[in-house]
Each structure stands twice: as structure tokens, then as C-alpha cells.
Amino acid sequence: MARVFISFAMEDKSLRDFLVGQKRNARTSIDFTDYSVKEPWSSSWKTNCRQRIKTCRGMIGIITPNTPKADGQLWELKCAIDEGVTLMLIHGYNASERKLSTLPTVISGRQVNLWTEDNIVNFLNRLG
């Protein structure tokens, strides 16, 4: 089972909870160990967060209209890129009016996938 860091804007915590809930559903093939940060840490959170990200096989970034203002999430995404952690971005919402038209600089040019079981399972399978 792959160890995965889930990056999300704190305003989108319910989406992270939903993704973790999907893996608990016996009818899905989604299986991973959630290593996301659930609560903001103290002033040393970046050091702790970087260590946690480095120990993961991959990161799933949940991208929503809250992402551009989410300094912590943007830092996590940049950290994963800098550390060479395999990254998959998914839209938090599949409705076109809730998708970002312009991605933040740190992830500009990267593909943002639809949030589907197949996309997530394929990503997890690539992690080994």
C-alpha cells in the first residue's frame, strides 16, 4: 500500500475527508496510507511537513478555487516537486464552473485530472 500525502486548502478539508472515505469503501479499489497534515502545525510545520512529504511515494493535490489563496497547500505542492515526489493533481469538483481557469504558478502547465476512481487507482498503481 502506497504512502500518499494529500495536499488541500484547509477550506477544502471536507474533500480530503471524502477522498479518505473513498479508500475505506469496500466497493472501490482505492488503497493508500494518508500522510496529509490534518491540522496546522506550529512555526516548525514546514520542517515537519517536508519530512512527511519526503517519506511518501506520491502526493495527490486537490485543486479548487481555494488553492490560489492557500499558502500552505501551494508550499506543499512546491515541496513535492522539489523533492521529486510523484504528484497527481485532481479537480476537487468536476463541475466546470468550479474548476480553476488559471493554475497557480507552482503548478502551471501541469495536468489536473478529473476526480475518478480509475484516475486515482491508476496513479496509485504507478507508485508501486
Language-model features, listed with the residues they occupy:
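Conserved N-terminal substructure of TIR/SEFIR domains
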Residues: M1-T55, G92-Y93, G128
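Arginine/glycine-rich "motif VI" loop of SF2 helicases in the C-terminal RecA-like domain
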Residues: R24-T28, C79-L89
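Inter-motif core of Ras-like GTPase G domains
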Residues: G58-G61
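Conserved TIR/SEFIR loop-to-helix hotspot centered on a Trp-containing motif
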Residues: N66-V85
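Short beta-alpha junction loops
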Residues: L87-E97
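Glycine-rich, charge-decorated loop segments at or immediately adjacent to ligand/cofactor-binding or catalytic sites
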Residues: A95-G109
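Short acidic-hydrophobic, aromatic-tinged amphipathic segments that line or gate anion-handling sites
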Residues: S108-D118
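A charged, well-structured terminal subsegment
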Residues: D118-G128
